[in-house]
């Protein structure tokens, strides 16, 4: 039996825990600006039609009285760690798929004599006792049915008010199709808006109606991969098991900007900032990667990606940034860039083996860098490539980025020094010189308000009282979708 545990309205519920004055009020966490999106909201906000992934501007129109908060990723991560500790007390077979949800293989726990429903209720009690948060639990023989069951267990809300959910829903063996077939077809994994519209044109609105379509017809209409996938799910077939440790396939950062960027030099600087964040996360995870990918989304939402595979695995900002800026240089950005992303994939464990810093000319894989990266600094330290560290605001030190090639040994020593400084003094204590400004270093880190740029300070949370208002008016520089992808990149992320 597989169990799916999902914290209810996680980010918003944490905010209510941290500020009890928000209890009973519509609270929306996400990007507060025109290009922001809703990350989570309380059920009081859902009663007005607000939901996650909705544009923040629309959420504000639907529920103008809501408290809008930019979110505090670091605090959510703390609660997530405690949440997963509770789950591991039940079974070592825990597959975390987000900060607030996970799959559990509970076959071992069930052999101790309790039913899966009893185990689900105990899980909810322990999560609430440890975190003060509510969780919904679903159980079934397959992963996707367990997730559907947890969704069915959740509270619901409309203008009439919030109604508590069952808390625990178990789909017993033999009852799968009775549960599944009445559901709307959009409940299935893989049915996005475009596929949903296509299926509706064929008269398919429920999972049961989809199950009645021959697989060959689905393959002809949707393609072999999606057609077969949906046919299997419609008959409750899902062979995936709980993976206790999911392999990370890529590490990426991306950012949505409050205005479209058109200046190539400004975008090159942003590529350096994103590359520095990716490199730092790679090293902390003990990983290195061979393929560097950039993602560019223009103002009209057209999106392009470009990749280059290097001869060796890398984990340092200079080499990643140099590759990213070279890829960016081959794209016409003057039409305006809404979002920029940098990612590294084809990962390996252990130290990177960087024998060169992509000197001009063919790299070790035989590829030629089409243009040198922008001159954005030289390696820190007294070596031959630079005179030493560059002072940043507040007496901090800016290490450097990517202009001229440098010996691998020099970069390795510099990188180790940067990591030691950041471990002791924080991520913003040292970084690429090009990122230094009057306000200090603009480094990119995981959780830097991931849901869109902030609204202007005077409009971010008009009318929100107290501490909540102060947090909502906090300026948020950036938005990111950070993915440690357990498989192919999600939603186009590099």
Model-derived segments and spans:
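Conserved alpha/beta core segments of nucleic-acid transaction machinery
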Residues: 352, 358-360
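Short, hydrophobic beta-strand segments
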Residues: 102-108, 301, 305-308, 359
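DNA-contacting surface of Y-family translesion DNA polymerases
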Residues: 187, 195-338, 349-352, 493-494
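Short clusters of hydrophobic/aromatic residues that line enzyme substrate/ligand-binding pockets
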Residues: 38, 168-171, 185, 251, ...
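Gly/Gly-Pro- and Ser/Thr-rich, intrinsically disordered tail segments characteristic of DNA damage-repair
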Residues: 1-229, 242, 280, 362-379, ...
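Hydrophobic, well-ordered secondary-structure elements that form the walls
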Residues: 294, 342, 426
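Surface-exposed, charge/polar-rich loops and edge strands
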Residues: 346-351, 423
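A generic structural signal for short beta-strands and their flanking turns/coil linkers
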Residues: 23-25, 64, 133, 290-292, ...
């Amino acid at each position: 039996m597989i169990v799916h545990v999902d914290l209810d309205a996680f980010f918003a519920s944490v905010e209510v825990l941290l500020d009890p004055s928000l209890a009973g009020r519509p609270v929306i966490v996400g990007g507060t600006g025109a290009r922001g999106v809703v990350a989570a909201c309380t059920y009081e906000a859902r009663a007005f039609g607000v939901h996650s992934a909705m544009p923040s501007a629309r959420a504000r129109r639907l529920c103008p009285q809501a408290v809008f908060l930019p979110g505090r990723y670091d605090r959510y991560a703390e609660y997530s760690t405690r949440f997963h500790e509770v789950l591991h007390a039940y079974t070592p077979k825990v597959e975390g798929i987000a900060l607030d949800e996970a799959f559990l293989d509970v076959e071992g726990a069930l052999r101790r004599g309790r039913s899966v429903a009893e185990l689900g209720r105990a899980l909810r009690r322990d999560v609430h006792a440890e975190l003060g948060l509510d969780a919904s639990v679903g159980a079934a023989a397959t992963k996707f049915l367990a997730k559907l069951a947890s969704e069915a267990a959740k509270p619901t809300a409309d203008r009439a008010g919030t109604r508590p959910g069952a808390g625990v829903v178990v789909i017993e063996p033999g009852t799968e199709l009775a549960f599944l077939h009445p559901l709307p077809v959009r409940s299935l994994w893989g049915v996005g808006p475009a596929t949903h519209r296509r299926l509706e044109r064929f008269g398919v609105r429920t999972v049961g109606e989809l199950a009645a379509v021959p697989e060959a017809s689905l393959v002809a209409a949707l393609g072999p991969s999606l057609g077969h996938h949906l046919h299997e799910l419609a008959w409750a077939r899902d062979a995936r098991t709980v993976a206790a440790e999911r392999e990370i396939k890529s590490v990426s950062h991306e950012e949505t900007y409050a205005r479209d960027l058109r200046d190539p030099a400004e975008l090159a600087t942003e590529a350096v900032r994103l590359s520095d964040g990716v490199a730092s996360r790679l090293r902390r995870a003990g990983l290195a990667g061979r393929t560097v990918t950039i993602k560019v989304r223009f103002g009209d939402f057209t999106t392009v990606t470009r990749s280059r595979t290097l001869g060796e695995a890398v984990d340092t900002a200079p080499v990643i940034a140099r590759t990213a800026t070279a890829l960016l240089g081959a794209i016409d950005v003057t039409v305006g860039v809404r979002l920029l992303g940098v990612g590294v994939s084809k990962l390996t464990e252990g130290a990177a083996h960087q024998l060169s810093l992509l000197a001009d000319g063919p790299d070790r894989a035989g590829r030629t860098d089409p243009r040198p990266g922008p001159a954005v600094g030289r390696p820190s330290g007294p070596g031959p490539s630079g005179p030493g560290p560059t002072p940043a605001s507040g007496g901090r030190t800016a290490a450097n980025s990517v202009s001229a090639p440098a010996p691998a040994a020099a970069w390795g020593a510099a990188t180790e020094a940067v990591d030691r400084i950041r471990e002791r003094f924080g991520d913003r204590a040292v970084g690429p010189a090009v990122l230094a400004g009057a306000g200090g270093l603009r480094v990119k880190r995981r959780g830097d308000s991931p849901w869109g740029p902030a609204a202007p300070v005077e409009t971010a949370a008009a009318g929100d009282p107290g501490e909540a208002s102060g947090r909502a008016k906090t300026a948020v520089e950036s938005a990111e979708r950070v993915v440690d992808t357990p498989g192919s990149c999600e939603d186009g992320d590099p």
